[in-house]
Amino acid sequence: SPALKKLGVKNRSRLFEIPPHIEYLTVKPHMKRYMQVSAEIYGVLLKYVAPEDVHVYSIDEYFIDSTPYLPLYKKTPRELAQMLLDAVLEATKIYATVGIGTNLFLAKVALDILAKHAPDFIGYLDESLFKETIWHHRPLTDIWQIGNGIANRLHKYGAYDLHGITMVPEAKLYKEFGVNAELIIDHAWGREPCTIA
């Protein structure tokens, strides 16, 4: 949790790694219930968008291509997001967050880094905002698809944020990461070639 992170406890720590002076509760997961609620939320979304425009990314995350729905509902992306958040809250009593982006990567980063700290639970990124707000964000491991292993390998080249990655010669990145360098480079520039379709 963010509170534990502030106390220096790393994400995905094992219980014995938590310092003894920190009080905490362990709560057993209720996967059956989580799956039921996830299905409820998915059902709410399908009242507003077609299944072919939704990609279920995980039990608690969805990508939605909202392009055809903006003119249909006569809403901006933020207004549509708020409409969906309100519908989910009304149906499930669960507060959700939304990341809006001009591509899947920017939407995911807007969710992970901006929305969870926004008062309205909505984060937005386009290519120019990405360079202003995310390009120099640290640590790299906050960025979607960059784990500790990849981050440590990037650190060898002096890259500690996405902007730093853009400064590394591409040939070095391809030598280090092979074909996976292409995605790392695209993401460093805020690009994402994949779509929901």
Label for each model-derived stretch:
Residues 1-186, 194-196:
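Gly/Gly-Pro- and Ser/Thr-rich, intrinsically disordered tail segments characteristic of DNA damage-repair
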